[in-house]
Amino acid sequence: MERIKELRDLMSQPRTREILTKTTVDHMAIIKKYTSGRQEKNPALRMKWMMAMKYPITADKRIMEMIPERNEQGQTLWSKTNDAGSDRVMVSPLAVTWWNRNGPTTSTVHYPKVYKTYFEKVERLKHGTFGPVHFRNQVKIRRRVDINPGHADLSAKEAQDVIMEVVFPNEVGARILTSESQLTITKEKKEELQDCKIAPLMVAYMLERELVRKTRFLPVAGGTSSVYIEVLHLTQGTCWEQMYTPGGEVRNDDVDQSLIIAARNIVRRATVSADPLASLLEMCHSTQIGGIRMVEILRQNPREEQAVDICKAAMGLRISSSFSFGGFTFKRTSGSSVKKEEEVLTGNLQTLKIRVHEGYEEFTMVGRRATAILRKATRRLIQLIVSGRDEQSIAEAIIVAMVFSQEDCMIKAVRGDLNFVNRANQRLNPMHQLLRHFQKDAKVLFQNWGIEPIDNVMGMIGILPDMTPSTEMSLRGVRVSKMGVDEYSSTERVVVSIDRFLRVRDQRGNVLLSPEEVSETQGTEKLTITYSSSMMWEINGPESVLVNTYQWIIRNWETVKIQWSQDPTILYNKMEFEPFQSLVPKAARAQYSGFVRTLFQQMRDVLGTFDTVQIINLLPFAAAPPEQSRMQFSSLTVNVRGSGMRILVRGNSPVFNYNKATKRLTVLGKDAGALTEDPDEGTAGVESAVLRGIPILGKEDKRYGPALSINELSNLAKGEKANVLIGQGDVVLVMKRKRDSSILTDSQTATKRIRMAIN
């Protein structure tokens, strides 16, 4: 206090004021503070002070030739005095204006290319439509959103390598461009920016905007795709919102949206196959989204969605540590629990085995249309604070929280038996059984839960069992809040494991995700999704299955042909023929298969009856488990276009039509490709690779006796050589391998050697 009084006294004396305002600062410490180092200590003051001077800018001497000494108004643009301590000219800010108006112009061709993101933004805003402003309370929740429309999805490191390669190609330093997108972008940008005069540093900054996803954790009440986020300040305030429709879409939003659709389709399809994990991986690896491999998008795209995260987990990528239940993302914010198996009885006296979480825990729950804070103890809901867009969304969140709490009154509210199954007809686990049950009808659950009187707390109201708001009473422990609950902000990713049924667990064994959590919502993808996997042929209906099956046979005819003659069983069991079976009438499958297999066997036995077109036509029918019978067919039926259509055993039909002249096959009128008999070889026939383990040595050698047929080769001893008749009557020398280890490469070498041996 003493010091303050003393200061007050000092300040009341005019001399003190004079010293502080009029005299110069000559204390060494202060001078040091403001002059040491290159860093400006008070930039705003420095700027004001500089701009108050007549010549605050220095420029190279060449400026004197490029700018007149005075402008049209007769104001001086530069001073003849040199800048103290350097060889530069002092220049007035008016010179900048003169330069901007009268200075040299350069080509503007590169501007739209370098400042692409800005030009595109202007276009989007120009074509966007702004609707009316509504005044209402905004329930905003913080979500991690993409703030940079129109970017590729490279990691910072990948982008850095691309930028260095494009902007500073001659700089030293190791740059590794590995991913497809890196290489494509680098090539494209190098071409676009040839002879670009814009400062390299600027180009680098702008490239970064184009290549890297930038996310921020922002309060949002509405659309979260980047074209909405760029106008967030125009569309939502604290108590108002303005309707807005973007004037264009950007690829990154389309990729996010299409990725989710592809992932959902793939997870749903994998669930019903014999080995879900293997199928899922096969589909992810063979799918393209907008022309880019799905696995590459998964590696780069940080989108968090249940199906996308299951695909990432299968690929061994890290995912967020939050878990999913009932379509809500749960993140534990405090507390802990141990899991114990317990048997409980439903209201229908059905026994359920559930894993009970023992202990006090707090969670945030975030869904698309509602969010909540949940506090629970062992099988008891202590408090649930919900906020949502409407009554329906709030009810969804309450049901999920009540089931998750594992309370006894919830289990006792079950009426009837629980026997929900997933797509593969397997029973769901007990927690999902309960969830599905109450999602269908939650009346009993809400009625049995119990209600309590409530205190008047700012911003919170009660909700009754019929989901109407109330200020007096509320469902026990449940309150509705005006404020939303923020999404989990951390971008931390954890290592997870996945089992063959696609259940994803963290390292402690907690289930984070399972196929039950994948949304059933169907949407239309913005980018073309190309599923090359036969498992996804069904997605576009029976016609697509038919066309794809025949296309596959034609594309792989070389290998199919060899397997047909040597290893038919392996061929018949190929998964590519699975979807086709659903088109064949159930009652006829086994008979058709037996008939076609017998026909094929006769072709193999009787030389010269090999008929390529007929084999292709009938092959898919041979894939079903056969039934041996004497039945003969002249046509086989497939169910497409809502009725049975016939495929003739010999000759063309509306379903299968081969044009000998053009060598093209049309299936249901759609082109299914051209049948090129071994385009590279021109000679090798069915046996182009002869047999695995029997490599071709070269041209025929008479010393090894007359030519054998392919089928006689199996009698050769290891190391024995023989001449063999292959394809179109050509004879080559072969030898049976002594070891089996290098068998894999045989078929590749064989193809090359046949060429050499025959030419």
From Swiss-Prot:
GO terms for cellular component: host cell nucleus; virion component. The record marks E627 as: Avian adaptation. The keyword S-adenosyl-L-methionine does not apply. One of its GO terms (biological process) is cap snatching. It comes from the Viruses. Keywords: Cap snatching, Eukaryotic host gene expression shutoff by virus, Eukaryotic host transcription shutoff by virus, Host gene expression shutoff by virus, Host nucleus, Host-virus interaction, Inhibition of host RNA polymerase II by virus, mRNA capping, mRNA processing, Viral transcription, Virion. One of its GO terms (molecular function) is RNA-directed RNA polymerase activity. It is found in: Virion; Host nucleus. Its main location: virion. Plays an essential role in transcription initiation and cap-stealing mechanism, in which cellular capped pre-mRNAs are used to generate primers for viral transcription. Recognizes and binds the 7-methylguanosine-containing cap of the target pre-RNA which is subsequently cleaved after 10-13 nucleotides by the viral protein PA. Plays a role in the initiation of the viral genome replication and modulates the activity of the ribonucleoprotein (RNP) complex. Belongs to the influenza viruses PB2 family. This is Polymerase basic protein 2.
